[in-house]
Each structure stands twice: as structure tokens, then as C-alpha cells.
């Protein structure tokens, strides 16, 4: 039976690291890579900088932002800021091959881990839904303003789909001058 196994599988990726699958032997405490996601165009994770920064929202809450860019990307580069913040769904800062083209052309990619998701637990989720939904929108706007203030970006494109599309529409209505461009996929 599986519960008698002497090894486990570990899956790992980051915004710069394609998915790695390890076998980890419990008794020996040793791991080995058994599978690595292949990128047909080639990929060197050492060419990228990853950062986790925190923006302070309207009520003092620290909002995490995950950022990836090429090491040679200048300050104030165009940025694509993604957000969701609904249904307790955490947006993992994992690898996506579809982002590489933008990042390799000098854009910054950022994920705003706003309230409504579960990134910081159940209270984080509860403080971004129903009567507290405005927190999600304010958190997202705060993240964009933080990226500008820290000279990470001047021009920010925002992106979200479904409930994230609602986030994009609300953020544009609340603070239209904060954003350069917006993509609201299937908003409701």
C-alpha cells in the first residue's frame, strides 16, 4: 500500500523555475529529480530576478506582491499586474511558459495576492468577500500604486478573468488614472 512507501514525490516550481518532480527517499532523506518540464525555446532561470514585496493597503494590511523580471530589465519597465482575490483561491507564484515572451521582451510580471484569496488564511479570505469586497479592489489599486512608487513601473497593465475581471472593472472605476491598460476576461 502507498502508506507503506519509503518515498514520496515532491513537485516544485517558482515563477522562474519550470516544474521539477523529485523522488524523495524518506529513510535516506535524499532526493533526485525524476522529471523536469522542458521549455522548447530554452530557458535559464538564472536570467531572472524574483521578488516578494509588500504594499500597505488603506487599513494597514500588508498585501504580498510576487514579481518576476529579467535581470537586465530597467527600472520603470512596463508591468503586467495580475489579480483575482475571490472564492478563497490562492494564486500561486508558479512557472508559466506563456509569460516568458513578455518578460523576455523587458516587461515585469507581478501577482497581487489580495484579500478574497486564501494566501494568508481564512481571515484573509473573509476580509475580501461580501461586505468586505471593497478591500480586494483597494488592495489591488494599492499594489499598482506601490509598483509605481518603488520605480518598478510607470505603465501598468492590469489583468484578471472571471471574478478577476470584476476586480479589473472595479479597480478601473475607482482609480482610472492608476492604470495604463486593462484586460478584463469574462468579467461578471
Language-model segment annotations:
Residues 11, 83, 185:
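Conserved residues at the C-terminal ends of beta-strands
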Residues 4-17:
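Short beta-strand elements that form the blades of beta-propeller/WD-repeat-like
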Residues 16-24:
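Structural motif
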Residues 177-187:
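A conserved short beta-strand
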Residues 26-30, 35-162, 167-170, 174:
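Cap/lid segment of the alpha/beta-hydrolase catalytic domain
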Amino acid at each position: 500500500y502507498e502508506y507503506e512507501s519509503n518515498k514520496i514525490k515532491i513537485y516544485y516550481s517558482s515563477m522562474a523555475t519550470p516544474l521539477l518532480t523529485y523522488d524523495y527517499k524518506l529513510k535516506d532523506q535524499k532526493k533526485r529529480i525524476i522529471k523536469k518540464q522542458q521549455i522548447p525555446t530554452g530557458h535559464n532561470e538564472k536570467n531572472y530576478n524574483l521578488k516578494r514585496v509588500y504594499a500597505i493597503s488603506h487599513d494597514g494590511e500588508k498585501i504580498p506582491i510576487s514579481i518576476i523580471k529579467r535581470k537586465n530589465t530597467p527600472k520603470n519597465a512596463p508591468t503586467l499586474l495580475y489579480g483575482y482575490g475571490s472564492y478563497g483561491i490562492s494564486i500561486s507564484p508558479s512557472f508559466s511558459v506563456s509569460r516568458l515572451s513578455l518578460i523576455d521582451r523587458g516587461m515585469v510580471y507581478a501577482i497581487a495576492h489580495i484579500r478574497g484569496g486564501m494566501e494568508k488564511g481564512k481571515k484573509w479570505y473573509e476580509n475580501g468577500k461580501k461586505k468586505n469586497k471593497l478591500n480586494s479592489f483597494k488592495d489591488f489599486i494599492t499594489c499598482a500604486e506601490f509598483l509605481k512608487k518603488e520605480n518598478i513601473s510607470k505603465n501598468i497593465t492590469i489583468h484578471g478573468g472571471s471574478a478577476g475581471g470584476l476586480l479589473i472593472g472595479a479597480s478601473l472605476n475607482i482609480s482610472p488614472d492608476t492604470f495604463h491598460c486593462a484586460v478584463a476576461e469574462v468579467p461578471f
